From Swiss-Prot:
This is Glycerol-3-phosphate acyltransferase. The chain crosses the membrane at residues 3-23, 55-75, 79-99, 113-133, 155-175. It comes from the Bacteria. Belongs to the PlsY family. It is an enzyme of class 2 (transferase). The gene is plsY. Catalyzes the transfer of an acyl group from acyl-phosphate (acyl-PO(4)) to glycerol-3-phosphate (G3P) to form lysophosphatidic acid (LPA). This enzyme utilizes acyl-phosphate as fatty acyl donor, but not acyl-CoA or acyl-ACP. It catalyses: an acyl phosphate + sn-glycerol 3-phosphate = a 1-acyl-sn-glycero-3-phosphate + phosphate. It is a multi-pass membrane protein.
């Protein structure tokens, strides 16, 4: 039991590692929270620091979610324990102890978490994100559409009630973290991301 609890605590601390903040400081010598959208996330790093820095941040955030959940099964192979570990990773990223509990929006880490928990709903969500982004160039819109699909696909693909409830809770958290983006989308003032546009 002690090992299980320690693993969850370690997962929270790993999830709390502020990838965007660290990468931005290392590359642009700036506090990512003070530039662009002010969000400590991969998209803001991509836009304000550079493509390479953004990709590094994205990969780091995904791994923060995937690795702890994947290896949780070696400690306890019950799905409920994996969900607890996944929740710790998400909470760590969104409410990081290293930045006064003000972290990212949870999309990339959520992607890692869900790929470790359930592959098909994650692949469908990734495809939905891609389509929404390609047609709109809004990362926030793609993220919102993708995360909304998760509880729906997990339900229709026959996953347990426990899974559906967990994905629904994470969906609500991510949508809440995107509340300012939603406001800007409605006002048509949200920034688009053009990957191949030169700075």
């Amino acid at each position: 039991m002690l090992i299980k609890i320690l693993y969850i605590i370690i997962t929270y601390l790993c999830g709390s590692i502020p990838s965007a903040y660290i990468v931005a400081k290392a590359n642009g010598k700036v506090d990512i929270r003070t530039v662009g959208s002010g969000n400590s996330g991969a998209t803001n790093v991509f836009r304000e620091i550079g493509k390479c820095a953004g990709v590094i941040t994205l990969i780091a955030d995904i791994l923060k979610g995937f690795i702890p959940v994947y290896f949780a099964t070696f400690i306890d192979n019950s799905f409920s324990y994996s969900v607890a570990v996944a929740a710790a990773a998400m909470v760590g990223h969104v409410f990081t102890i290293f930045l006064k509990f003000k972290g990212g929006k949870g999309v990339a880490t959520g992607l890692g978490v869900f790929f470790a928990l359930m592959r098909w709903p994650s692949l469908i969500a990734l495809a939905i994100f891609g389509l929404a982004f390609v047609f709109s160039r809004y990362v926030s819109l793609g993220s919102i559409c993708a995360v909304i699909s998760l509880p729906l696909t997990s339900y229709f693909l026959g996953y347990s009630t426990e899974v559906v409830i967990f994905t629904f809770a994470i969906t609500l958290l991510i949508i809440y973290r995107h509340r300012t983006n939603i406001k800007r989308l409605i006002e048509r003032s949200e920034n688009k991301l053009r990957i191949f546009k030169k700075k």
